[in-house]
Amino acid sequence: MRSLGPCAVLVVAFWSYWASAQENAAQEAAHRRAALAHLPADAAQRVFGREATPAAGPPEAIGAYERGCLEGAVALPADGPNWQVMRPSRNRAWGHPVLIALLERLAHTLPAAADWPGLLVGDIAQPRGGPMLTGHGSHQIGLDADIWLTPMPSRRLSAAERDEMPATDLVTADGKDVDEATWTPQHRRLLEAVAREPAVERIFVNPAIKRALCRTAGPDRSWLTKIRPWWGHNYHFHIRLFCPIGQPDCRPQTPPPAGDGCGRELDWWFTPEARLPPPGPAKPLLLGDLPHACASLVAAP
């Protein structure tokens, strides 16, 4: 493994995509303290990270998935039929109402559609969206959600258990394929069912998981277009929704390339070049780097 300089280490600490699902409360708190020790006072991560309540007003996804904020957020309840919110101490179960409604509906339909017992829901967004101190570069406008690839237990977990319970790693140690000891046909059915949702723009998974899906997708492979390989994501998958209708300040992402994404595009992820750390911002985001409306939103009571 190549040596990383101090700046690169700091970037990885801020944007450690692969660490967010499995970190327990103590580990996440340590990364939070490290981030706060280096961030300038006007860093957007610091400003949005201290907000504990949503901004009143109509729901509005403002800006881009990786550079924006969220007005009128609602929280996914900690418990519901066929779902449980994980890592509750992070206070990241907030989202645009369109996303929260989708998660609740998926929790209702997936037991029958995918033989999946229920959703363990990871990070969604902060109460007012915006950049996070740890774990994510996106999740800023309430349209991203992490779903653990661990089946929901048959009992209700305590808050302490939800902050400490480890997530299941589905990828082999060398990163080349799924681990047959943990990967199941239900995982494929789960991801296919979610990808077929019209509101879902794309789903991020580990490249090894994409490779397994390419092998087993069946004759109708259209849903694979939405399954996008990305660093980490061996413990959870990341749902991203399209900008909702009537949200003019929401900036859509460039659509993924046509096709199932199972050829040379996927092969790159298993090259030495792809083993380098994921790209991160050259410097912390400042409040002025976000859409102008975000400064007013974060200043509101």
Kindly give the residue locations of the regions a language model identified.
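N-terminal low-complexity, Pro/Thr/Ser-rich intrinsically disordered segments
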Residues: 24-67
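Bacterial N-terminal signal peptides that target proteins for export
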Residues: 1-7
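Active-site acidic/histidine clusters and adjacent loop/turn architecture
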Residues: 49, 53-121, 183-190, 197-200
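Short, surface-exposed glycine/acidic/tryptophan-bearing loops
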Residues: 134-151
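Envelope-exposed proteins and targeting segments
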Residues: 115-120, 141-145, 199, 233-237
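Catalytic cores and adjacent binding grooves of peptidoglycan-active enzymes
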Residues: 23-41, 157-301
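Extended, low-complexity, intrinsically disordered C-terminal regulatory tails
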Residues: 49, 102-134, 204-226
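N-terminal signal peptide c-region/cleavage motif recognized by signal peptidases
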Residues: 16-18
